[in-house]
């Protein structure tokens, strides 16, 4: 495979490099370089538009320019720090979005920042109307770099850095765990010699004198984990061309280690090789073409098992993963023979430990269970042809695009089995020895490589469009786009394809570059609906006014640009129609009841799963938005702001409340209730971008601020609650619901005087006490209330601040992001500790008679804890945070130093990512309990241009 990859890379580089031609001519582009910088072309739906002519709902990031001061490794890395309207999760608070790379639906994680020219965020409904159904919730359009006319330019960039874990979970050691577990048994009335740990056992575990007999297992010890993991990458870019052909090539490779330092896991790694080539060809004065290809080879190697999940569950006193062979009594020939015959002697001196209850464990898995490799391959190809039809009609052009993408992935593994040994310990003359050894399991290494998890995906996209541009009498500027587009995505083991097909029209008119009218429409199609409802019309209209071009501002030297616009749209989408044939009725016998028939035979009933609704139709996005943009003081200050209000109407559910109760039965399970367009959601919000450029002395400063705020409301729901406070209608759509607490029960009298709590178990002092919202003297689900916003689609308020300072060859860059207004529950097993769960440091604040006035945690229990461990404001915390996301210092060698040399540019930089979190809940927000830790990343890099 490695030889194949190298040949492929060399062929691609030679092919693209050969396009470079001596004596390249200068560009004859009518737009000057200075104009491109002040008013660049921006990729919007199926066309490029001058940034000053965009009438709102669109933001753009120049990634190529950004990388000069902020090197990063993910295409969407902290984009909320640069543009308003994107909060890191969604556009304008919607619950989905479409990612396009060079106009084709693709994955954002399969294009690196070094390959990207610009990213356009199309937020408003008017901006995405031409994309049809699948683009109705917003589009992120990523355009890759292309070749330019000029000499061949070779750029090489290399980076290496280290991820350093921010924090690890803190679990109790064996002795403390055993002590508190005994306390939990006492609380439950279950303590006794057969259930409780003895004082002697607790003492022996506490001393640490023999951790093999009395283990005190710490998953986060330096015995198992490295302090950091390395990530290194190298990228080569080659570009150039002449007036006939231009090319761009990107070849990149990165490798990343893992934290583990033992067993098969010490060789864990992932690596990615990518080759991209983009070619533009001027066939003749009337025809242009482009051919783009990209190939990605991704591999990951991992030991068998999930270490981080095991670390959250395996108690510290359960096992000793490795036991020295030297502890076996010297005259125990049988045990020594049994151990020496195993296939898994670790480091020549340890055998795998376990218990009869723990016949496998993650440590033994990492040493002896084998390993797996994940392999992913992607090939992407697209071609475009542009026809200038001026001989037919001046200003008329035609463009067409065709793309085919293939992606495949699979797992290969060596799946071994192993035995563990359970020692029986004795003490002779004060020394611990293993007097007997039990073996459980079978050692087996078949040497067979297994293949599993094979998946394939194919995407085919096509578009064809006519474009028309003309100016009448120097004041009437008209442009239009008529586009037909569609794509299909086929996935293995999925019968129906994901499809999108639409016909779109956009007509733009402006008078004297002052008054703008944009009219857009698309005819969308969906096979997920019944015949007669599969097509829908989506209109959009925008009015704009460039005040700067009015006479009353024409001579205002402080105002460079001032534009106001307003848009209204109704888009139809099938994105929330999850399956095909939801409009059809459905019957089956899966939940049918058995009933007797003749001669003792039984028959199962055929039941209705749902009724039919042939009137099921598209969900509608109805939106009104306004936008203002300005540039002041010779581009010293630029600002853009949008306000939006939209309603997603006709979301599909099965509305039980509008049908008689007998339409559904619980046994046998049956229903005649069909799917229907019923639920409605409303979102209201704004986004702001402000940029300030200023030179102070010899330092050039650039300060950018971005903000996004949105509020949501469930305006219609299928509900029939007994009490108004239970209704979801009128509340935030990402609402978190739960009980309100009144602290802990103080004593038995307090329990008897309070409403009965019906969640299970016997209520005792130290349990959580809840508010009886409806005063029915019972605490149950009817007492759950709205507690706050979950921020499922991004924080309600998102902030971003970026600062650039340039002094001679030095550049300082800093980026901060913040999210405010959301809440979350501490509801993982790290916080909800009960039964035989692993005890975290949180339980130290448990309620006892001695700590009843200061307790921060309910009484301990070995039972389910159903009363305490449920959603309530006791477990609620605010996720408000500000992150120092990036700091980078760069240095560019002066041009004078590089004169007459082969090097045109040399720059070096150091950076740190995810450096600081400012929050009252910092420790909670920075902690991962069942996955790899969050990390700070420290990087050093160099870039050389030939």
Regions found by a protein language model. Give the residues of each.
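A generic structural motif
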Residues: 65, 255, 525-527, 694, ...
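Short, small/polar-rich motifs associated with maturation and membrane association
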Residues: 1-276, 288-290, 930
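Extracellular/periplasmic, surface-exposed regions of secreted and cell-surface proteins
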Residues: 278-287, 293-297, 329-347, 353-415, ...
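Glycine-rich, aromatic-lined ligand/substrate-binding cores of catalytic
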Residues: 394, 793-825
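Outer-membrane beta-barrel proteins
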Residues: 104-147, 167-172, 215-235, 254-292, ...
């Amino acid at each position: 495979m490695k030889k194949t990859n190298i040949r492929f890379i060399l062929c691609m580089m030679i092919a693209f490099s050969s396009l470079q031609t001596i004596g390249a001519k200068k560009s004859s582009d009518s737009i000057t370089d200075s104009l491109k910088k002040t008013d660049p072309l921006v990729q919007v739906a199926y066309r490029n538009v001058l940034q000053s002519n965009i009438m709102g709902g669109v933001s753009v990031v120049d990634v190529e320019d950004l990388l000069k001061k902020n090197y990063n490794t993910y295409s969407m890395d902290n984009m909320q720090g640069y543009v308003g309207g994107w909060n890191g999760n969604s556009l304008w608070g919607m619950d989905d979005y479409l990612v396009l790379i060079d106009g084709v639906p693709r994955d954002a994680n399969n294009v690196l920042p070094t390959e990207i020219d610009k990213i356009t965020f199309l937020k408003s409904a008017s901006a995405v109307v031409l994309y049809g159904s699948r683009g109705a919730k917003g589009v992120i359009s990523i355009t890759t770099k292309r070749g330019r006319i000029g000499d061949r330019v070779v750029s090489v960039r290399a980076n290496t850095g280290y991820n350093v874990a921010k924090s690890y979970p803190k679990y109790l050691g064996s002795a403390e765990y055993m002590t508190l577990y005994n306390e939990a048994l006492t609380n439950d009335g279950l303590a006794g010699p057969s259930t409780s740990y003895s004082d002697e056992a607790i003492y022996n575990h506490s001393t640490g004198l023999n951790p093999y007999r009395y283990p005190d297992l710490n998953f986060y010890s330096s015995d198992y984990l490295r302090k950091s993991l390395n990530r290194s990458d190298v990228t080569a870019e080659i570009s150039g061309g002449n007036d006939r052909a231009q090319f761009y090539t990107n070849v990149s490779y990165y490798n990343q280690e893992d934290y583990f330092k033992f067993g098969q896991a010490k060789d864990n790694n992932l690596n990615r090789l990518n080759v991209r080539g983009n070619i533009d060809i001027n066939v003749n004065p009337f025809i242009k073409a482009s051919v783009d290809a990209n190939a990605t080879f991704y591999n990951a190697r991992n030991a068998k098992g999930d270490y981080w999940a095991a670390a959250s569950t395996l108690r510290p006193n359960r096992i000793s993963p490795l036991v020295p062979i030297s502890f076996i009594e010297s005259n125990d020939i049988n045990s020594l023979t049994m151990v020496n015959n195993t296939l898994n002697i670790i480091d020549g001196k340890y055998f795998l430990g376990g218990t009869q209850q723990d016949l496998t464990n993650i440590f033994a898995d990492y040493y002896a269970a084998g390993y797996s490799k994940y392999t992913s391959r992607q090939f992407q190809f697209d071609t475009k042809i542009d026809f200038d039809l001026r001989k037919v009609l001046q200003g008329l052009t035609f463009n067409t695009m065709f793309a085919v993408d293939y992606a495949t992935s699979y797992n290969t593994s060596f799946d071994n089995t192993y035995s563990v040994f359970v020692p029986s310990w004795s003490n002779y003359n004060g020394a611990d020895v293993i007097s007997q050894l039990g073996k459980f399991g079978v050692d087996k290494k078949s040497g067979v490589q297994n293949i599993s998890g094979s998946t394939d995906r194919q995407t085919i996209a096509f578009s064809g469009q006519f474009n028309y541009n003309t100016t009448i009498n120097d004041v009437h500027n008209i442009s239009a786009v008529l586009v037909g587009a569609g794509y299909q995505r086929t996935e293995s083991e999925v019968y129906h394809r994901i499809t999108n097909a639409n016909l779109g029209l956009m007509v733009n008119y402006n008078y004297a570059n002052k008054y703008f009218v944009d009219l857009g429409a698309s005819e969308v199609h969906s096979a997920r609906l019944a015949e007669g409802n599969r097509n829908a019309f989506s209109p959009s209209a925008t009015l704009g006014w460039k005040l700067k071009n009015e006479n009353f501002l024409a001579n205002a030297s402080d105002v460079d640009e001032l534009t106001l616009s307003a848009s209204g749209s109704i888009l139809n989408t099938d994105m929330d129609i999850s399956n095909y044939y939801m409009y059809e009725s459905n019957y089956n016998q899966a939940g049918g009841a058995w009933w007797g028939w003749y001669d003792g035979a039984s028959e199962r009933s055929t039941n209705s799963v749902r009724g039919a609704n042939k009137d099921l139709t598209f969900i509608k996005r109805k939106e009104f938005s306004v936008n203002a943009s300005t540039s002041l003081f010779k581009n010293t200050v630029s600002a853009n702001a949008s306000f939006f209000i939209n309603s997603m109407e006709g979301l599909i559910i099965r509305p039980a409340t509008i049908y008689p109760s007998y339409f559904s039965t619980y046994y046998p399970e049956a229903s005649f209730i069909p799917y229907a367009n019923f639920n409605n959601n409303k979102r209201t919000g704004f986004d702001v971008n402000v940029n300030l450029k200023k030179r102070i002395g010899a330092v050039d400063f650039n300060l950018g601020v971005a903000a996004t705020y949105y509020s949501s409301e469930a305006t219609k729901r299928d509900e029939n609650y007994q009490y108004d406070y239970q209704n979801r209608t009128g509340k935030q759509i990402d609402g978190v619901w739960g009980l309100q607490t009144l602290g802990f029960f103080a004593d038995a009298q307090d329990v008897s005087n309070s409403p009965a709590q019906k969640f299970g178990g016997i209520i005792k002092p130290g349990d959580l006490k809840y508010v009886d919202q409806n005063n029915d003297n019972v605490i149950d689900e009817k007492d759950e209330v709205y507690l706050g916003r979950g921020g499922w689609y991004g924080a309600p308020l998102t902030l971003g601040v970026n600062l650039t300072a340039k002094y001679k060859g030095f550049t300082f860059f800093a980026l901060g992001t913040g999210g405010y207004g959301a809440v979350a529950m501490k509801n993982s097993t790290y916080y909800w500790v009960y039964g035989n769960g692993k005890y975290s440091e949180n339980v130290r604040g448990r309620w006892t008679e001695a700590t009843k006035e200061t307790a921060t945690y309910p009484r301990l229990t070995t039972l389910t804890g159903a009363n305490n461990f449920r959603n309530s404001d006791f477990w609620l915390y605010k996720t408000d945070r500000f992150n120092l996301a990036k700091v980078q210092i760069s240095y560019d060698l002066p041009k004078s130093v590089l004169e007459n040399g082969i090097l045109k540019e040399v720059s070096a930089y150091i950076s740190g990512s995810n450096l600081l979190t400012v929050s009252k809940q910092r420790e909670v927000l920075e902690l991962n309990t069942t996955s790899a830790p969050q990390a700070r990343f420290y990087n050093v890099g160099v870039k050389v241009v030939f």
